[in-house]
Amino acid sequence: MASLLGVLCGWGTRPEEQQYEMIRAAAPPSEAEPRLQEALAVVNALLPAPITLDDALESLDDTRRLVKARALARTYHACMVNLERLARHHPGLEGSTIDGAVAAHRDKMRRLADTCMATILQMYMSVGAADKSADVLVSQAIRSMAESDVVMEDVAIAERALGLSTSALAGGTRTAGLGATEAPPGPTRAQAPEVASVPVTHAGDRSPVRPGPVPPADPTPDPRHRTSAPKRQASSTEAPLLLA
């Protein structure tokens, strides 16, 4: 009877209430926070209005946009470094054989840097930043960077343009610095005695005009041996006269 009254009056056991967790604000994982901060620093250096970490983590699309902008910003900085190095090359003064390659790479770097900058500004500053055109531009820029081996190729050309390579350039000159070339080395010391020894060997057959130091080893015969030869001939002619 009591149980019946309890059921009718609602005195029975109540079901447990559901537990709800508070939704926290978007926060990056602890291992990914340094990379996101570095990406923000690189991207904000190119944006007129900087963005915050909360703006980047507001949605998944914004996070992906930050990752793509970071790749574009790194590509942009690599292009600017290569342009700065290639600008030190003076056409016609040092290694004329690489003037065409330097000019071609300079145009390619400038075009790629402008593409990266325009894409970053479109992703964050334009109204229609959520369309797929930004993804296409990002893919094209990254593909262009990978296919042409811009980093390795431009470093090699910049080293040759700045004279950092030890190999000699065409024309027999070696680049010594920015806009200066070093002439080929002159005759060494070992070649000078050979030129001076030619008249010495020919002049040994005749008596010198003025006294000078006698060389230690003279290949010419001694003059005393030449004077003794007529004496031996004279003694041979006098021998028959004495016998007669």
Curated annotation (Swiss-Prot):
The keyword Ribosomal protein does not apply. The keyword Phosphoprotein applies. GO terms for cellular component: host cell Golgi apparatus; viral tegument. Plays several roles during the time course of infection, including egress of virus particles from the perinuclear space and secondary envelopment of cytoplasmic capsids that bud into specific trans-Golgi network (TGN)-derived membranes. InterPro entries: Herpes_UL51. Pfam families: Herpes_UL51. Residues 175-244 are annotated as: Disordered. Oligomerizes. Interacts with UL7; this interaction mediates UL7 incorporation to virions. This is Tegument protein UL51. Disulfide bonds: none annotated. Keywords: Host cytoplasm, Host Golgi apparatus, Lipoprotein, Palmitate, Phosphoprotein, Virion, Virion tegument. It comes from Human herpesvirus 2 (strain HG52). Transmembrane segments: none annotated. Belongs to the herpesviridae UL51 family. Residues 210-220 have a biased composition (Pro residues). It is found in: Virion tegument; Host cytoplasm; Host Golgi apparatus. A lipid is attached at C9 (S-palmitoyl cysteine). Phosphorylated.
